[in-house]
Amino acid sequence: MSFSDNLAKIVDKYENLGKKLSSGIMGDEFVKASKEYAELEEVVEKIKEYNKAKSELEEANNFKLEVGLDNATLEMIEDEIHTLENSLPKLERAVKIALLPKDEADSKSAIIEVRAGSGGEEAALFAAILFNMYQRYAELKGWHFEILAIVDTGIGGYKEASASIKGKDVFSKLKCESGVHRVQRIPETESHGRIHTSAATVAVLPEVEDVDIKLEDKDLRIDTYRSSGAGGQHVNTTNSAVRITHIPTGITVALQDEKSQHKNKAKALKILRARIYEEERRKKEQKRANNRRGQVGSGDRSERIRTYNFPQGRVSDHRINLTLYKIDEVVKNGQLDEFVDALIADDEAKKLAEI
């Protein structure tokens, strides 16, 4: 089947679904048809744009062959042909991108977890910088940023921190942030001006609802204990801290931020669902991709993905060899779009090359 035939088949399916929805179907059949119709809507819109440009190019070429056209008209037609010939490859690429298999998690909100890695207190300070950077980015995008938990060091650093980021397509934008982030800078306590290197790990998980991941009570072990502060001292006289273990997978989440055990449990369950869902999603993706390497957003947390060099004022993403000399704009103001957009474009190009 040719590319054009395949596109015509998709448009036919979309139009038939529209007729089906207008015919008065109900229940599960309506829900299924509505979902399919919505999934095809964007694709069909791009197909129609592509077909329109193709049709206009054919008409312009035919018109050019007509006898008796004056020079001004010929020049106008040739300009139109040139414009359409330039736009067609872009429109075709847009159609192919729309036809790529979708990650079902892309439209979801996200949970982001930042943990200090190697580098002691410097790593904890860097983890706090990264966490604040993502908060700024969320604000720029108009997303809702809710802190779930912070384990601080007492002097400005974070051992670990997590947040829920709600909005449209949040996960599709942030999933490429998963991995090891490295920082090179001169600590304030460094008297000889030596550059220290430390790291923090970022994990981005799709936020899921109860309907996506059902947790059975029999599969959960819930432990409660007294919460402690940065120095290890107990800061609460009641067992408000919660540790939940999902027995089948061994995944564990511990929360002690809230004074209420109930609130800590609710937050811990939210993170637990996200981690279980992400584990299942990753296994499916691995199987579907047939061990494809180098995938942007694969979530490989052992992969060093980006370096923040403060003395040089640069941020370098090692996956796409992109370096920006605007560290303050990126880190302090959360201006991540240049990296995010470039990573998404690179991922799309790799997937298109496999078609």
UniProtKB/Swiss-Prot annotation:
NCBIfam families from the UniProt entry: prfA (TIGR00019), PRK00591.1 (NF001859)
Xref: PROSITE patterns: RF_PROK_I
Keywords, ordered alphabetically: Cytoplasm, Methylation, Protein biosynthesis
Post-translational events: Methylated by PrmC. Methylation increases the termination efficiency of RF1.
Region (Disordered): 280-310
GO MF terms held by the record: translation release factor activity, codon specific
PANTHER family xrefs: LD18447P
Protein name: Peptide chain release factor 1
Organism from which the protein derives: Rickettsia canadensis (strain McKiel)
Main location: cytoplasm
Recorded name of the encoding gene: prfA
